[in-house]
A protein has these predicted regions:
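Short gly/ser-rich anion-binding loops that grip negatively charged ligand groups
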Residues: 59, 75-81, 398-405
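Long amphipathic alpha-helical segments
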Residues: 333-405
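Short, surface-exposed, low-complexity cationic segments
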Residues: 46-67
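Active-site loop segments of alpha/beta catalytic cores
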Residues: 1-6, 36, 45, 70-332
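Segments that shape or occlude catalytic/ligand-binding pockets
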Residues: 2-26
Length: 405
């Protein structure tokens, strides 16, 4: 949760963008061109743009009417991507191992994005309200496609990580109400990320968006790293709320990535982000884009410099502790140590430890702690699930005469 040293941006990942499926689906996207993807969506990639974008006009939109989506939407056949895996896997694994990095398989255009690539952004959001049944059918079809895709990718590439894209909001808000996201997209993604986790692969979800209202859902459905965490999400507050359930990768927003950004400005921005976010743990400082590097290379240089400087210093991590119960004299007088023991001790060694501490039975407590260690229990569990439980039961009556560690 609080590594030493702090990871720097994408340095832990070797991203494979040349696997047979990604090459088949996105290989014709070239800067300065207009092309069609395998779903039939027109993709424009202007010379001066940071990335490609879908084009929607009445003539070009693949699915202009979701009530007839089965007539116009044709899922790409990934069975044609059966060749070239061994060469790709061998080359990518060798490169990742040589760099001491994790091999990451890349999956662009997630379930929501695929919907608006086919229909247009406004029509997708409108259809969620006006045609929910048809949208569920389309989403299920895309989900099945993504599950087939990731199965083939894991089988063929054997990656350590799957890096999957799907933007769910702007920098200030979700694209839809949280309950609507839960209704249409939460369960499909639970299946998607659940499958990846079942294969022993790390899950990273890219969304450079404001996602505070659904961050607990993201952790629940199996996302391990949220890449693209914008500063607008209030990262320190999220760290306190999540308590390690989700690693946040981001913090360096697009506002600093400018041609006129000066070294002192970039360093000051990065240092402030590091000082606020790194002590909370489960944080990887990074540009929030969905692939490594900034648009303007000099910005990346100074962001990296700030992280390296941070790592050269001495930092004391923040360790959250459970709240200490208030202690009142009146309650202490009312509290008495139970004299009698129950006829039958609980089979739970942690419960027995809590009871022994609560009753002030020092020898028994020490004996039970040794028993727990002999049974393979972790010291941290003995403390948190046994001793601290007993202390909390004592509450206001807790004192040096009543309990001990």
């Amino acid at each position: 949760g609080q590594p030493e040293p702090q990871l720097c941006q994408y340095e832990a990942l070797h991203m494979c963008l040349t696997d047979p499926i990604n090459t088949y689906l996105r290989g014709n996207r070239k800067r300065g061109t207009v092309s069609k993807d395998r779903w039939g969506t027109t993709i424009s990639f202007p010379e001066d743009a940071p990335g490609p974008i879908p084009v929607h006009t009445p003539e070009l939109t693949v699915c202009p009417d979701v009530t007839h989506w089965k007539d116009t939407v044709h899922v790409p056949d990934l069975s044609v991507c059966s060749e070239g895996w061994e060469e790709c896997r061998t080359r990518s694994r060798a490169a990742a191992d040589a760099e001491g990095k994790l091999l990451a398989g890349f999956m662009g255009t997630g379930i929501f994005e695929q919907c608006h690539f086919l229909m247009g952004f406004e029509d997708t959001l409108t259809a969620l309200y006006e045609h929910p049944d048809e949208m569920r059918e389309l989403i299920e079809t895309i989900t099945q496609y993504r599950l087939d895709y990731v199965r083939r990718l894991i089988d063929g590439l054997q990656p350590d990580v799957i890096f999957s894209h799907d933007d769910w909001g702007t920098k200030n808000a979700l694209f839809m109400k949280p309950d609507m996201w839960r209704e249409f997209f939460k369960e499909p993604y639970r299946r998607f990320y659940g499958y990846i986790r079942s294969r022993g692969v790390i899950t990273i979800h890219h969304a450079d968006s404001y996602l505070v209202p659904i961050v607990d859902d993201m952790a629940e459905i199996g996302i391990q790293v949220w890449q693209g965490t914008l500063p607008e999400n209030d990262i320190p507050a999220l760290q306190r709320h999540l308590s390690g359930k989700l690693t946040l990768m981001g913090g360096f927003g697009a506002a600093i990535d400018r041609a006129d950004a000066q070294p002192d400005e970039i360093l000051a921005y990065a240092r402030d982000t590091l000082a606020r976010c790194c002590p909370g743990g489960h944080f990887i400082p990074s540009i929030t884009y969905g692939l490594a590097s900034t648009v303007f290379p000099h910005v990346d240089q100074y962001l990296d410099q700030a992280v390296n400087e941070y790592n050269a210093g001495l930092h004391i991590p923040v360790t959250p502790l459970p709240a200490v119960p208030k202690r009142k004299i009146s309650a202490a007088k009312a509290e008495v140590v139970q004299a009698a023991t129950s006829a039958q001790e609980s089979a739970d060694v942690f419960e027995n430890i809590a009871r022994a501490l609560e009753r002030g039975q020092q020898k028994k407590l020490l004996s039970l702690c040794q028993q727990a260690l002999d049974e393979g229990c972790r010291p941290s569990d003995i403390l948190s699930r046994g001793m601290i439980v007993g202390m909390n039961r004592l509450g206001e009556a807790f004192s040096a005469n009543r309990a001990f560690v």
